[in-house]
From Swiss-Prot:
Keywords: Ribonucleoprotein, Ribosomal protein, RNA-binding, rRNA-binding. Belongs to the universal ribosomal protein uL24 family. Part of the 50S ribosomal subunit. It comes from Burkholderia multivorans (strain ATCC 17616 / 249). One of two assembly initiator proteins, it binds directly to the 5'-end of the 23S rRNA, where it nucleates assembly of the 50S subunit. One of the proteins that surrounds the polypeptide exit tunnel on the outside of the subunit. InterPro entries: KOW, Rib_uL2_dom2, Ribosomal_uL24, Ribosomal_uL24_CS, Ribosomal_uL24_KOW, Translation_prot_SH3-like_sf. The keyword Mitochondrion does not apply. The keyword Ribonucleoprotein applies. One of its GO terms (cellular component) is ribonucleoprotein complex. This is Large ribosomal subunit protein uL24. GO terms for molecular function: rRNA binding; structural constituent of ribosome. GO terms for biological process: translation.
Length: 102
């Protein structure tokens, strides 16, 4: 069970975007893509077959999962734990003890 999932609101706790918040767009094995965070400029060649024009595009790149933390109700970074409730594993915030949605 992943501790961080798509749709979670997270805060960056390390790196060039430290302190910024965003919503998780995708989760890979050990990396997360966060909306509007870790933007890089990529040069794109024009391709008439795809109908794209050339130029420089800003693209969101993945961050390592250890560099982000879930935001709790108070707006602070929180670690996520896993516990068993009624025979099912659920994620909970270590700071407040609140259970995260499935």
């Amino acid at each position: 069970m992943n501790k961080i999932r798509k749709g979670d609101e997270v805060i960056v706790i390390a790196g060039k975007d430290k302190g910024k918040r965003g919503v998780v767009l995708a989760v890979a094995a050990d990396r997360v893509t966060v909306e509007g965070i870790n933007l890089v400029k990529k040069h794109v060649k024009p391709n008439p077959m795809k109908g794209t024009t050339g130029g420089v595009e800003a693209k969101t790149m993945p961050l390592h999962i250890s560099n982000v933390a879930v935001v709790d109700a108070n707006g602070k970074a929180s670690r996520v734990g896993i516990k068993v409730e009624e025979g099912k594993k659920v994620r909970f915030l270590k700071t407040t003890g609140a259970v995260l949605s499935a």
